């Protein structure tokens, strides 16, 4: 019987991505304000607070929205921190409770008058007010739809986790596109850029090929980087590495290699679709070009952030970036 591997090598994704990363000049001031905002609600246990600080959410926002103005950047920081709260709470809930948590967020996003008195509702309402200062009607309508899909997907994820179900590839990919919240993060592009794209852009098959290739690239790379942390926490079922291992009957290294190959295909698909984008006239084309560049910032920014934070690789994140070797962590015992 083969022994359980003690380590695996990450795929080298940086050479696949021909984009230049950058960071936001407003990071230091806005990050401190957003951290203070989230900490003022006392939503974390000591252990969760340490994980929150270690995760460097605002640093992710700096890498992925480097072009955003101060107000927009601060709002994006607040949103990613708010998502962290929703995600961390629902990760430890059953399907029914995760759905309730998601619905609190969703109702507070939809209706400025709704309030159940919870901390999550108050935080969400404050984020909503910031968002609506600059979001156009199309942008906000799409964002709300993504919120609905996200809440539904997170509840389903919790139900599958409760039952110990690992999905097949096709079902997982559909779920992952929604429960990753990447569509919500992409939904902030128009807000940051000060544009409101016509709906017909999002109905164009070439644009959506580009969109899904970018979204999947973020999801797949995130999963391979977060796999070790998630399997140690006992929540590895919602990860493409686990899905590939089960679907193909392969070990962790073969699954990571498969992720690398798929990311190569995704980037080829993205670059091909980018060349084939139609024209909708100068003003729309300019707005679309900004949106496309924003997707590219997310792709490269997510890769760079993953090795600057301790969230996935702890204190050895720089060493892991250099060697790509990850030592498998033992299962954690939750002390909370």
UniProtKB/Swiss-Prot annotation:
One of the record's GO molecular function terms: alpha-copaene synthase activity
Similarity comment: family membership: Belongs to the terpene synthase family.
Binding annotation for Mg(2+) 2: 87
Keywords: Lyase, Magnesium, Metal-binding
Entry keyword Magnesium: yes
Binding site for (2E,6E)-farnesyl diphosphate: 311-312
Domain notes: The conserved DDXXD and NSE/DTE motifs are important for the catalytic activity, presumably through binding to Mg(2+).
Site (Plays a critical role in the stabilization of intermediate cation): 84
Organism: Postia placenta (strain ATCC 44394 / Madison 698-R)
Motif mapping: DDXXD motif: 87-91
Record function comment: Terpene cyclase that catalyzes the cyclization of farnesyl diphosphate (FPP) to various sesquiterpenes, including alpha-cubebene, beta-cubebene, sativene, cyclosativene, sesquisabinene, alpha-copaene, beta-copaene, cadina-1(6),4-diene, alpha-muurolene, gamma-muurolene, bicyclosesquiphellandrene, allo-aromadendr-9-en, epi-cubebol, cubebol and delta-cadinene.
Reactions catalysed, as given in the entry: (2E,6E)-farnesyl diphosphate = alpha-copaene + diphosphate; (2E,6E)-farnesyl diphosphate = beta-copaene + diphosphate; (2E,6E)-farnesyl diphosphate = delta-cadinene + diphosphate; (2E,6E)-farnesyl diphosphate = beta-cubebene + diphosphate
Protein name in the entry: Sesquiterpene synthase 10
Domain of life: Eukaryota
